[in-house]
């Protein structure tokens, strides 16, 4: 028993009108996580899910199909929602958790179906993998997402540098993230922050299609560091 709620559009429009051009209003797809595999990993232990995918793949696909149908039902209620961007995916589909082979079989087809439905309502989609993208770059492109995040560097748990990902995907998909939220943004010096922003702009953002941002949440970052980060980003111009 898992009823699917309908999205209320009025509060979203109110927030969108308040925010205007001062930020990006993100939306979501219903569930503990937006992606089907990722949602399943919240319903059962991820280790058990991985073992089941190898030993009982038909059962896992049946579960994912049930979740997909519910998510598509929710997406229908999103028509007209004033979101700038819809986040899908989730960390348990990253290549730091599962193999590219498992991602291809148990994530790609379901992600693609959701993204097609979202694009049918004229939404832009960003696919979240918590930085573990090595080996699944082509699948992220193939699933139809408009952007890939969080482009986490190895220093904060990713498995390739942001510019390595950029070289592989080129201009086929936008990238969001790239800044180590702890070692650079929280504990780094102003010069460290500025240098990293400029490096990312030159190596990742040189051809456009890049939003320079932290690779994950930052809870203890000094406000002054955020100001340095924002000021450095403003200096990056084409």
Walk through the language-model features, giving the residues of each:
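Active-site loop segments of alpha/beta catalytic cores
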Residues: 1-238
């Amino acid at each position: 028993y898992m009823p699917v709620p309908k999205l209320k559009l009025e509060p979203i429009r109110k927030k969108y009108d308040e925010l205007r051009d001062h930020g990006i209003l993100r939306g979501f797809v219903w569930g503990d996580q937006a992606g089907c595999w990722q949602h399943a990993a919240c319903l059962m232990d991820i280790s058990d899910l991985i073992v089941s995918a190898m030993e009982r793949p038909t059962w896992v696909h049946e579960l994912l199909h049930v979740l997909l149908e519910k998510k598509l039902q929710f997406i229908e209620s999103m028509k007209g929602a004033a979101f700038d961007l819809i986040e899908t995916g989730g960390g348990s589909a990253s290549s730091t958790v599962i193999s590219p082979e498992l991602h291809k079989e148990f994530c790609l087809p379901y992600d693609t179906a959701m993204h097609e439905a979202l694009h049918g309502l004229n939404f832009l989609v960003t696919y979240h993998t918590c930085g573990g993208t090595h080996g699944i770059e082509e699948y992220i492109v193939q699933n139809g997402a408009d952007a890939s995040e969080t482009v986490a560097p190895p220093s904060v748990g990713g498995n390739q540098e942001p510019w390595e990902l950029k070289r592989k995907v080129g201009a086929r998909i936008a990238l969001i993230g790239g800044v180590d939220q702890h070692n650079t943004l929280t504990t780094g010096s102003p010069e460290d922050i500025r240098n990293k922003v400029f490096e990312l702009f030159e190596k990742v953002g040189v051809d456009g299609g890049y939003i320079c941002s932290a690779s994950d949440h930052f809870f203890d970052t000094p406000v002054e560091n955020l100001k340095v980060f924002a000021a450095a980003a403003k200096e990056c111009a084409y």
